[in-house]
Amino acid sequence: MVERLAELERALGITFRDRKLLQTALMHRSLFNEQPHLLSNLSDNERLEFLGDSVLHFVTTTWLFQQFPHQNESTLTSWRAALVSTKGLAECAATLNLGQYAFLSRGEDTPKGRQRSKLLADLFEAVIGAIYLDQGLEAARAFIEPFLHERIGTLQTAVLDPTTRLQEIVQSRHKQLPKYYLIDERGPDHQREYVMAVTVEGHEYTGTGPSKKAAKKAAAQAALADIDR
């Protein structure tokens, strides 16, 4: 185990004062479900993940605010949501091969299990939490910001359609997906018109179009227009 942690420290570019924090960051809950006796002197990584999530959001928000002083709130929110999404964090974790260092139950310990996006994202957040506790906010910031610099270019060049932008904003703020549904369908077959609605935090927004997809985009755009105000 000592060599395993030392190897990860080299990959992270960080030497921990309290290496047990790094060890805890790698402890998946499944291990304790399978071997509950371990709980007497070890704990899973969920508390560190919780802390790391908050540190990550703070550092990412501050970095975006400082790097893009003229960008509007809606765009910054979309970028932040993409940067801290499960997919995005899993990609960051994969560059460090975090999955291979995780302590898992026998049921989870498979090549596929170690590469699950949720597992990797949780590990990444837990490691951030461990860095923060061991060495403070500036060390955590120094660890996080290179990943932000690396990934922001892709987000800037990507043209997000309204439904994607709305989904990222709603997920970031409310941890849930927008809900779309068909309200009306009218007109002759050769000139069909659809009316779609989307519900965001109890508010309904509608849009029309020659296809359900177009109407869905229009509804999302209406929601974004209200959110951006």
Curated annotation (Swiss-Prot):
One of its GO terms (biological process) is rRNA processing. Mg(2+) binds at residues 49, 122, 125. It catalyses: Endonucleolytic cleavage to 5'-phosphomonoester. InterPro entries: dsRBD_dom, RNase_III, RNase_III_dom, RNase_III_sf. Keywords: Cytoplasm, Endonuclease, Hydrolase, Magnesium, Metal-binding, mRNA processing, Nuclease, RNA-binding, rRNA processing, rRNA-binding, tRNA processing. The active site is at 53, 125. SMART domains: DSRM, RIBOc. PROSITE patterns: DS_RBD, RNASE_3_1, RNASE_3_2. Residues 161-229 form the DRBM domain. Pfam families: dsrm (PF00035), Ribonucleas_3_3 (PF14622). One of its GO terms (molecular function) is metal ion binding. Residues 5-136 form the RNase III domain. Its EC number is 3.1.26.3. It is found in: Cytoplasm. One of its GO terms (cellular component) is cytoplasm. Its cofactor is Mg(2+). Belongs to the ribonuclease III family. Digests double-stranded RNA. Involved in the processing of primary rRNA transcript to yield the immediate precursors to the large and small rRNAs (23S and 16S). Processes some mRNAs, and tRNAs when they are encoded in the rRNA operon. Processes pre-crRNA and tracrRNA of type II CRISPR loci if present in the organism. Homodimer. This is Ribonuclease 3. It comes from Chloroflexus aggregans (strain MD-66 / DSM 9485). The lineage of its organism: Bacteria, Bacillati, Chloroflexota, Chloroflexia, Chloroflexales.
